[in-house]
Amino acid sequence: MNKANSFNKEELIACGHGKLFGPNSPRLPVDNMLMIDRIITINDNGGEFGKGEIVAELDIKPELWFFDCHFITDPVMPGCLGLDAMWQLVGFYLGWEGAEGKGRALGVGEVKFTGQVLPGAKKVTYKLNIKRTIHRKLVMGIADAILEVDGRQIYSATDLKVGVFSDTSTF
């Protein structure tokens, strides 16, 4: 298992193919749905709650796929993609801790959008504070997160929940 404290884009893509933490670990999406270019730091003892934190980034370029279709003449990154990135990172954290199975977003307490990501922005930063992880019959991570664009906080989410399941056929 790779217990590194940072990951580059190639390693994140390897996670999407089951080649970073192992073939049975939770996977990140690949291609357009991977909303992360790098993980700057990941640990299991930092953050607001002392149970772990993740800081990750996405480089913003005007040619990103969503700017062409959301919306014509008014391009903006869909808020749901930033929220999905937060769930992606909670699932990644569980895989980094050694969980095996398929990751699924289970919910979120509250989401607030107070700004937007436009094509002229340079960088999105995701900051997650792990609140709790459960590694029993139920495997689940819970985190609070914020999204910053060029250093300004514009999204927040509380109680992001991701579960890891050995069988999702009846989910």
UniProtKB/Swiss-Prot annotation:
Keywords, ordered alphabetically: Cytoplasm, Fatty acid biosynthesis, Fatty acid metabolism, Isomerase, Lipid biosynthesis, Lipid metabolism, Lyase
Q: Per the record, GO CC terms?
A: cytoplasm
* Disulfide bonds listed in the record: none
Q: What is the E.C. number?
A: 4.2.1.59, 5.3.3.14
RNA-binding as UniProt keyword = no
Active-site residue list = 70
* Top-level taxon of origin: Bacteria
InterPro entries per UniProt: FabA, FabA_FabZ, HotDog_dom_sf
Family designation: Belongs to the thioester dehydratase family. FabA subfamily.
Subunit-structure text: Homodimer.
Q: What is this protein called?
A: 3-hydroxydecanoyl-[acyl-carrier-protein] dehydratase
- Identify the species of origin: Shewanella oneidensis (strain ATCC 700550 / JCM 31522 / CIP 106686 / LMG 19005 / NCIMB 14063 / MR-1)
> What high-level taxonomic lineage is stated for the organism?
Bacteria, Pseudomonadati, Pseudomonadota, Gammaproteobacteria, Alteromonadales
Primary gene name: fabA
